[in-house]
């Protein structure tokens, strides 16, 4: 077993070069950094737009995980607005659990390039779940 936070052990996080930066308990905001691999580049040498959804979804999942004391999330929908091209290199995503309910959580995130420029925004709705194999609760 490793001492890494669970969200950094997920295969998708490893693929995107994820690093956990911080979690603010007061605002339920998780900050993660990613280093997309060269294979994420489009023909212009920038990160392909659709692939930016991955780090944003990953950070939103981390925000839900931390805001709900360890629940997993299944993304039901995600809306991504691309504001500017993202060069290959380190990116930072700040994701906030806006409202957590017993089953549904609303999340928002912002993605910044290595220069601190806001490059994308996303909102998502997710369903919180227990870890696979967990025994169902009384209301399952």
Outline where the language-model segments fall.
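Terminal targeting signals and extreme-terminal segments of soluble enzymes
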Residues: 1-140
């Amino acid at each position: 077993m490793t001492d890494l936070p669970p969200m950094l052990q997920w295969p998708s996080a490893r693929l995107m070069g994820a690093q956990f930066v911080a979690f603010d308990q007061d605002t339920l905001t998780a900050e993660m950094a990613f280093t997309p691999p060269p294979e994420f580049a489009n023909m212009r040498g920038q990160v392909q737009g659709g692939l930016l959804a991955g780090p944003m979804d990953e950070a939103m999942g981390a925000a839900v995980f931390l805001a709900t004391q360890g629940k997993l999330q299944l993304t039901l929908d995600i809306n991504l607005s691309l504001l500017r091209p993202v060069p290959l290199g380190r990116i930072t995503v700040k994701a906030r659990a806006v409202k957590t309910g017993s089953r549904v959580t609303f999340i928002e995130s912002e993605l910044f390039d290595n220069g601190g420029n806001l490059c994308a925004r996303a909102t998502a709705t997710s369903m919180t779940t227990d870890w696979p194999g967990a025994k169902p609760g009384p209301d399952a």
